[in-house]
C-alpha cells in the first residue's frame, strides 16, 4: 500500500496538469512554429519555464487505483499486476482468465 501522501501528491499533479494544459499547449505551439520570431519564441520559452514543474504531464506516475502501487501497473485495467491477478482469480474481470496450454 502506497503512502497516502504519495497518492495526494499524484492527485495534486493531476489537478495542475489539467489546470495548465491549454496554456502549455499554446506556448509549445508558439515554440514549435517555424515562422515565429526569435524574440517571441524566447518569450514563450521563458513563460513555459515559469509554469509550475508539476504541471507537466511527464511528471505524472501511473498508480494502481486500489493500492497506489507505482510499479507493475497495467494501463488497460488501471490496476497493478498483483491486484489484477487477485480480481481475475475471483472472476471479477470479464473475458480474462488464467492462461493454460
From Swiss-Prot:
Family label: Belongs to the universal ribosomal protein uS14 family.
InterPro entries hit by this protein: Ribosomal_uS14 (IPR001209), Ribosomal_uS14_bac/plastid (IPR023036), Ribosomal_uS14_CS (IPR018271)
Annotated PROSITE patterns: RIBOSOMAL_S14
SS bond list: none
Organism in which the protein naturally occurs: Shewanella sediminis (strain HAW-EB3)
Any one GO CC term of the record: small ribosomal subunit
Protein name in the entry: Small ribosomal subunit protein uS14
SUPFAM superfamilies recorded: Glucocorticoid receptor-like (DNA-binding domain)
Pfam families in alphabetical order: Ribosomal_S14
Protein task: Binds 16S rRNA, required for the assembly of 30S particles and may also be responsible for determining the conformation of the 16S rRNA at the A site.
Alphabetically ordered keywords of this record: Ribonucleoprotein, Ribosomal protein, RNA-binding, rRNA-binding
Alphabetical GO biological process terms: translation
Subunit structure comment from the entry: Part of the 30S ribosomal subunit. Contacts proteins S3 and S10.
NCBIfam families attached to this UniProt entry: PRK08881.1
MF (Gene Ontology): rRNA binding; structural constituent of ribosome
